[in-house]
Amino acid sequence: MKKIIGIGVSDGIAVAKAFIIQTPQFDVKKYTNVKMTPTQAKKLLSSAFQKAKKDLEEIKTITVKNINQEAGMIFDAHIQILNDPTITEQLEQQLNKNIHPVIAVDNVFQQTALMFSEMDDKYFKERASDILDLHQRLLSYLTGVKLNDLIRIKSDVIIVANDLTPSQTATLNKKYVKGFLTESGGKTSHAAIMARSMEIPAIVGLKNITSKVEDGKTVGINGRKGIVGFDFSSKDITQWKQEKELESNFQNELKQYTNKLVKTLDGYEVIVASNIGNVKDMDLAVEYNTNGIGLFRTEFLYMSSQDWPDESVQFEAYKTVLQKAKNDLVIIRTLDIGGDKKLNYFQFPHEDNPFLGYRAIRLTLDKQAVFKTQLRALLRASDYGNLGIMFPMVATLDELVQVKQLLTKVQQEFNETKKFKLGIMIEIPSAALAADCLGKHVDFFSIGSNDLIQYSFAADRMNKNVSYLYQPLNPALLRLIKLVVEGGKLNNVWTGMCGEMASDQYAIPLLLGLGLTELSMSASSMFKARMVIAKITINECKSLVEKALKLTSDSAVRKLVENFFKKKNIFI
């Protein structure tokens, strides 16, 4: 048997025949010399848009019926993209230049997808697949090239593809499709979300998988471990089927951990909250019984607008999430734009190192009118729930003092008394080292582990050449986190975490041992986190982290935790 390792995005084990899907090919260049008046072009494009919207409504209905309401809402987002003035205006500009609709659609949607794919934030990065899904659909109507018809599958298969669009995933028949393998995609892509909703295993990030696996041959997929097996012997198939039974038992056990409140065996309560990227994500978080929102990214409000969103638009979004959370804490991060997150209506200055430049709190302190609008919306929304306001990318005490002064000024304009908790993201080493000073001015810290790791090891986590330096369990990072927690405790400030490390099951006992009281993650990760927490004691965690801090490498710490889990019979 041969094995390939990828990124598991939906748990489960399956063994079935490979069904390879080829990406549709559109010969866009042949339309370069096809003449059409702007009026004719607009009529043709309008027809394609109407067909797309009709199809998406039908796919949504099927998805809600076969999967759930939340999965269906993905296609509301697709329809919103088609109605986005930025997209429609760019297309109209091209048509007015006598560019054929096929070429115009290809230009605009490819450029938009590229913009998202180059973003560092995984949530926004993976929206590129949604744009490309619509790109394929529109080109299909305009050129007559048919899309892959997955409804015709009538036997047990594992789909193998370069990528699966959300609309393709929605039409998969769970009776026959036992899992899928793709070259592209990530944990927060809509196709991955759909797979989890359908409860079928899925693995992404499998380079050249369509050429390594033979169509019609037996393949195995272990979604939790990210393992693909092929070229099976009969013994291999028997072994995989046995593992499938164990996996099924594990998944059934996970379903026991639905309670919002979770404690360690010795009664230490841990807040397991959810990260969301927009208002609709809140519904899935509520379905998974989240204990509040540890990170609400507000960038979507700005990136989906034609201009800086006004106070009323922001207020409605914040109010809705706060109301859905009832009285649970909702931490809303102020605008974190810049770096790889750009706006169509704002020209960022050229920078050699944009990730270390004009972004997040540095930008909003400079553009105070924009910042005040957001702060006013947040203050108004604070009447509707338990609000936490969090400032990103704070590097120095001076920055924090400046931003607090601005917030106080806005409060005075409102004549408002404080109805919120105030915190900062700790994602820059200078802030971690100064936590004792910063803690005097806030109510909470939330460690942004993704950037803290990146800046601590001077390694771009999206750069494959240095990805080996993404080491969340490295003792150096654990020591930095320890400083943050201790600095907070000196000022009665609690510390949580909202980066990917918070959902890393190997990291959880270490984080609890260091003193974190809140872990925020994607909704789908919460069951596993609750399970780990419920099977350990806080004293065990403290003892474990003491040992970890004496080690010298990420791999050594990982082995330490692995042995701890074995002794505790924790199956992950």
UniProtKB/Swiss-Prot annotation:
Tell me the domain of life: Bacteria
The residues forming the signal peptide are none
Provide the protein's localization. Answer: Cytoplasm
Q: Write out the GO MF terms.
A: kinase activity; metal ion binding; phosphoenolpyruvate-protein phosphotransferase activity
Keyword set for this entry?
Cytoplasm, Kinase, Magnesium, Metal-binding, Phosphotransferase system, Sugar transport, Transferase, Transport
The residues listed in the UniProt record as binding phosphoenolpyruvate, with positions renumbered to this chain, are R297, R333, N450, D451, R461
Q: What is its main location?
A: cytoplasm
The EC number on file is 2.7.3.9
Q: Does the keyword Transferase apply?
A: yes
Any one GO BP annotation for this protein:
N-acetylglucosamine transport
Enzyme kind, highest EC tier: transferase
Q: Which GO terms describe its cellular component?
A: cytoplasm
Q: Which cysteines are joined by disulfide bonds?
A: none
Q: Which Gene3D superfamilies match?
A: Phosphoenolpyruvate-binding domains (3.20.20.60), Phosphohistidine domain (3.50.30.10), PtsI, HPr-binding domain (1.10.274.10)
**Catalytic activity from the UniProt record:** L-histidyl-[protein] + phosphoenolpyruvate = N(pros)-phospho-L-histidyl-[protein] + pyruvate
Q: Where is the active site?
A: H190, C498
Task: Name what cofactor the protein needs.
Answer: Mg(2+)
A Pfam family matched in the record: PEP-utilizers
Q: Where does Mg(2+) bind?
A: E427, D451
Written domain comment of the UniProt record: The N-terminal domain contains the HPr binding site, the central domain the pyrophosphate/phosphate carrier histidine, and the C-terminal domain the pyruvate binding site.
Role noted for this protein: General (non sugar-specific) component of the phosphoenolpyruvate-dependent sugar phosphotransferase system (sugar PTS). This major carbohydrate active-transport system catalyzes the phosphorylation of incoming sugar substrates concomitantly with their translocation across the cell membrane. Enzyme I transfers the phosphoryl group from phosphoenolpyruvate (PEP) to the phosphoryl carrier protein (HPr).
Subunit (UniProt): Homodimer.
- Family membership, please give it: Belongs to the PEP-utilizing enzyme family.
Q: What else is known?
A: The reaction takes place in three steps, mediated by a phosphocarrier histidine residue located on the surface of the central domain. The two first partial reactions are catalyzed at an active site located on the N-terminal domain, and the third partial reaction is catalyzed at an active site located on the C-terminal domain. For catalytic turnover, the central domain swivels from the concave surface of the N-terminal domain to that of the C-terminal domain.
Protein name as it appears in the record = Phosphoenolpyruvate-protein phosphotransferase
Q: What organism is listed for this UniProt entry?
A: Mycoplasma genitalium (strain ATCC 33530 / DSM 19775 / NCTC 10195 / G37)
Lineage, highest ranks first: Bacteria, Bacillati, Mycoplasmatota, Mycoplasmoidales, Mycoplasmoidaceae
